[in-house]
Swiss-Prot record:
Gene of this entry: def1
Protein purpose: Recruits the ubiquitination machinery to RNA polymerase II for polyubiquitination, removal and degradation, when the transcription-coupled repair (TCR) factor rhp26 fails to efficiently displace stalled RNA polymerase II. Also involved in telomere length regulation. Binds DNA.
Taxonomic classification: Eukaryota, Fungi, Dikarya, Ascomycota, Taphrinomycotina
Species annotation: Schizosaccharomyces pombe (strain 972 / ATCC 24843)
Cellular component terms (Gene Ontology): chromosome, telomeric region; cytoplasm; cytosol; nucleus
Family: Belongs to the DEF1 family.
Intrachain S-S bonds: none
Protein name, UniProt field: RNA polymerase II degradation factor 1
One Pfam family, short name: CUE
């Protein structure tokens, strides 16, 4: 067996401790007897396998051959056993399992039982076995230390947090059979017990560091003593001392030789022990153990660090041991020697705990009792272990680390609270609660993040162990935590989303009149009549400068004189594509711009520069539109019946003009128009009986009467003769009346209706026209829409050209038939050569004079009568390029005739619209689309104005139908 023993240690005991234990004497000395005694002592608690140990002598008498064969078998058996153990306990290393197997005399079942019950410890763990049942609870120093150490070890094992050095733990295990006779093994617990039970040790000692040697000796020595002394009849005290020293060395991470290392580990251990003790001062076992244990002078404690913490903690006089002195010094280090700015970090700062992970818990300050740590409770099954015993397992690893981490790792940030000067290092062992809810100085037990959000009171309150003996990791928040939280709350506040379209950012936020507000009205008013940018020149008369005045009138204003305040432009209630557009159901207008969906050329037209009088500059042209997602048609709350009046000289385009004409919106002919949802089939006749009525009046000398010349444009008409409500004959209106373009009901998707936009005398592109009469354009959707263009033409353009020549008129206009308008095919007749109106009807317009646009039948002009309008659809161009198919600056192809290439000619070449008094009876009411009744309306020739339509193309999206 001696050979077998020799063979065994080589395999099993790679560590010094095992070899020391088994080979301290000759192989013969460490024969089966020793193993038997140790195994029996080890198993004393369990009472198993005693027979094998007893039969050791008989086995030793067997032949060496048998022993050799047994050794080989044991070796193979050990390998298989280790493999089984490793599968069962993957967290255990081979060395730990080998050692545990050795302790169980290579009994696999017993080894498993030891490990599962916590009686076997890993190399890094101090605790190894539960309290031997044979031994009484610590009435004497040795038994108490045994119980405490073993129970603590068990707790540690259960927590499965390995202590620092495995070597130490193994060495300790070998030596841990009996009650610790070695004072060094006892002294650490005693010092711990003293702080907890009696508070004899200075709190500084407790709080700072337990010398690594002390920690090891306390945790290991009990085990060592248990094995060696109880099982082995105590090896010589020197042997035990050496074992303890080696254990301490391992525990302190090979710092056993150095007093500093020992003191550091002792500090951490003592701090942990004392912290535990302080956490559970109530346990007398701790106190009794401390008292009973012999004073042992562990490795010389490191130079005492500043002891300010000492005074804060009612220093219980270090009881009789050098260990207490070692503890004192570590305590001094942790509490005061380490200069930590006492910031208002709560004393129970997890960071503090982390910094002193080597120590189990922080020692209580002066008022240790108030901070009694309820949290540190022995794991169930450790009932006999006093809270002081738990701190013991600040193991060699922790002790070694603690010696440095408690000093070096503890940074000034860790000690933030000057209210608690004493800081206890925290033990890393799982058995010890990571955080005891007691503050010592700015440090709390249980290493955690520096940033703690809980109050110190919470830390203290949370004394109960978490999940058996782990207290909740709570740290009192720094004083500024609340502020930070509030800041976070503020930052998390989500500001209400604001609509910031390019248009709105520029639009003056003028209020929408109450009469225009609908339940669906967008509360964000939109800028100005024309939806144009502010002129770069800052023209005060720009649209944005003075928002239009909105009138609630629902009838055409009464006749007035030329002294009226200025042009009045009627828009649909807040005007689609212009002015406010409040009734867009949340769809905000988006003006054309370079970044929009329309071509840059059209976007350029949006940039209005009134200061730029060059007719060739397309950027000087007002433009307004919005591309929006289609919205289903709405008929409710139609805004069509409202007038908007814009005072003279306050809006773009209305420079002083001779007659100060009014312009307003009236659409009585919409009575038969109803909205349909896109995709719906075209309705029956009369459904499209919509008409834009243009009534203009100019009180010019020589006029036969102050009656308006009423014209109406109908587009997309299904045969109907029921249009009604044109202004009564002889009713003079102070200005042209411009109706909104109605959306094409069968267009998919329905188009936004675009209002006529009129610009007066002296403004772009109406250069010095005689009276500055605004022109009205009626635009169709084009290929510039973000929906598939409908080139068939779904809208009409009506332009009135009146150079103001009041000469007699003669001649007759040829018939102007329009498809689907079968009831009114007689066309228009005029007796004055220059009296012309132009209707660009549906793509179905027929006639000798009809002309298709460049977009392929989008709209055609029929008849040359009443002055040729400027109809532009399609590509962009310039004023100078106005040939038949030239592109216009508005993105619209020009009407082919009678336009010329010279912009100047366009303002002068158009026939004048002479006074209609002479032919009032024979002149249908503006257009043949009316009921056919003659309009006794006469009008002086109005000032000529350019034949360019202000280009507003229909936009896809919702529209609101007719009132």
């Amino acid at each position: 067996m001696s050979e077998n023993k020799k063979f065994r240690p080589k395999k099993v005991g790679n560590t010094e401790q095992v070899s020391e234990k088994q080979h301290t004497d000759t192989a013969l000395n460490i024969s089966q007897d020793n193993k038997t005694s140790s195994s029996s002592a080890k198993r004393g608690a369990k009472g198993r396998r005693g027979t094998k140990g007893k039969s050791g002598p008989a086995n030793s008498s067997q032949t060496s051959n048998i022993e050799g064969s047994n050794a080989l078998e044991l070796e193979f058996d050990r390998d298989s056993q280790l493999s089984v153990l490793q599968e069962l306990f993957p967290s255990w290393t081979i060395d730990d399992l080998s050692f545990a197997l050795e302790e169980a005399d290579r009994d696999l079942e017993l080894t498993i039982l030891h490990i599962t019950e916590g009686h076997a410890s890993k190399w890094g763990e101090v605790k190894k076995k539960p309290i031997p049942k044979t031994k009484s609870k610590p009435t004497s120093h040795a038994p108490v230390s045994d119980n405490v150490s073993s129970t603590f070890r068990n707790a540690t094992r259960k927590s499965k947090k390995p202590s620092a050095s495995k070597d130490t733990s193994r060495g300790v295990r070998k030596s841990k059979a009996g009650a610790p006779s070695d004072p060094s093994s006892v002294h650490a617990p005693s010092s711990l017990e003293k702080p907890a039970g009696t508070g004899d040790l200075p709190s500084s000692e407790i709080s700072t560091k337990a010398p690594a040697s002390t920690t090891v000796s306390s945790s290991v020595d009990p085990g060592t003593i248990n094995e060696d002394s109880s099982m082995k009849d105590h090896t010589t005290s020197n042997e035990q001392a050496s074992v303890l020293t080696s254990a301490n060395t391992a525990a302190s991470t090979n710092t056993n030789g150095t007093a500093g290392g020992t003191s550091a580990s002792a500090k951490s251990t003592s701090a942990a022990d004392q912290a535990v003790a302080s956490s559970k001062p109530i346990k007398k076992a701790w106190a009794s153990v401390a008292k009973s244990k012999k004073k042992v002078t562990p490795a010389p404690a490191p130079a005492p660090e500043s002891e300010p913490s000492k005074p804060s903690i009612a220093p219980s006089q270090p009881s009789k041991t050098n260990v207490s002195a070692a503890y004192e010094k570590p305590a001094e280090l942790s509490s005061s020697s380490v200069p930590f700015p006492h910031k208002s970090q709560d004393s129970a700062t997890p960071a503090n705990v982390e910094t002193t992970p080597s120590t189990a818990t922080s020692a209580p300050k002066k008022s240790t009792a108030p901070f009694a740590i309820n949290a540190v409770k022995p794991a169930p099954g450790l009932s006999n272990i006093s809270s002081a015993s738990l701190p013991k397992p600040s193991f060699a690893k922790q002790a070694a680390v603690g010696s440095q981490s408690s000093t070096t790792s503890m940074t000034t940030a860790r000690l933030l609270s000057d209210r608690f000067p004493v800081v206890m290092p925290v033990a890393n062992t799982a058995a010890i609660p990571e955080k005891v809810q007691v503050r010592f100085g700015s440090l709390t037990l249980g290493g955690e993040d520096k940033k703690s959000t809980k109050s110190s009171s919470d830390n203290i309150a949370q004394s109960g162990p978490r999940s058996s003996y782990f207290p909740k990791k709570t740290v009192s928040p720094k004083p500024e935590a609340k502020k930070e939280a509030s800041k976070v709350a503020e930052s998390t506040k989500i500001p209400k989303k604001q609509h910031t379209s390019a248009y709105e950012s520029r639009a003056p936020q003028s209020k929408v009149p109450e009469n225009l507000k609908e339940s669906h009205v967008n509360e964000t008013p939109y800028r100005g009549l024309h939806d144009v940018n502010l002129p770069a020149s800052g023209n005060a008369s720009s649209v944005s400068a003075i928002p239009p005045q909105v009138s609630a009138q629902t009838t055409i204003p009464a006749a007035s004189t030329s002294a009226t305040s200025g042009p009045v432009v009627g828009k649909q209630s807040a005007g689609y594509g212009g002015i406010y557009s409040p009734a867009t159901h949340g769809i905000s207008p988006q003006p054309y711009a370079g970044a929009s969906l329309i071509p840059p050329s059209t976007g350029a037209a949006f940039n209005n520069e009134t200061a730029s009088s060059n007719a060739g500059e397309t950027t000087a042209l007002p433009y307004s539109s919005r591309f929006m997602n289609p919205v289903e048609n709405r008929s409710a709350n139609s805004p069509f019946d409202n007038f908007q009046h814009i005072d003279h000289s306050t809006e773009l385009g209305y420079a002083s003009n001779t007659s100060q004409q009014y312009q307003q919106t009236s659409h009585p002919a919409y009575t038969t128009m109803s909205p349909i949802e896109y995709g719906q089939a075209a309705p029956a006749a009369h459904y499209y009986n919509e008409r834009n009525q243009y009534s203009q009046y100019d009180n010019v000398a020589g006029s036969a009467s102050n009656t308006p010349d009423v014209h109406s444009v109908m587009h997309n008409k299904v045969a109907s003769s029921n249009a009604t409500s044109l202004p009564a004959a002889g009713t003079a209106t102070p200005s042209p009346v411009v109706s909104q373009q109605q959306p094409q009901p069968y267009a998919f998707p329905p188009m936004y209706p675009i209002p006529y936009v009129s610009y007066g005398y002296g403004t772009m592109p109406y250069n010095n026209n005689k009276f500055g009469q605004p022109q009205q354009g009626y635009m169709s959707q084009s290929g510039f829409n973000d929906f598939p263009p409908i080139f068939g033409g779904h809208s009409n353009v009506y332009n009135r050209q009146q150079p103001g020549n009041v000469s007699g008129m003669s001649g007759t206009q040829t018939s102007n038939p329009i498809n689907n308008a079968t009831a009114n095919t007689s066309g228009m007749t005029e007796k004055a050569a220059g009296h012309r109106d132009s209707v660009i009807g549906n793509g179905g317009v027929t006639g000798a004079n009809s002309m298709s646009s460049t977009l392929g039948g989008l709209s055609s002009m029929s008849g040359m009568g009443r002055a040729a309008p400027g109809m532009f659809m399609g590509n962009v161009g310039s004023f100078e390029n106005l040939s038949a198919n030239a592109a216009s600056p508005y993105g619209l192809p020009p009407q082919q005739t009678p336009l010329t290439n010279a912009a100047t000619q366009q303002t002068t070449s158009f026939q004048s619209n002479a006074n209609k008094v002479n032919n009032a009876n024979s002149q249908p009411a503006g257009f043949p689309f009316n009921s056919g009744a003659s309009t006794n309306a006469g009008s002086n020739g109005l000032g000529g104005y350019n034949a360019y339509n202000q280009s507003f193309i229909n936009r896809p999206g919702g529209w609101y139908g007719n009132a």
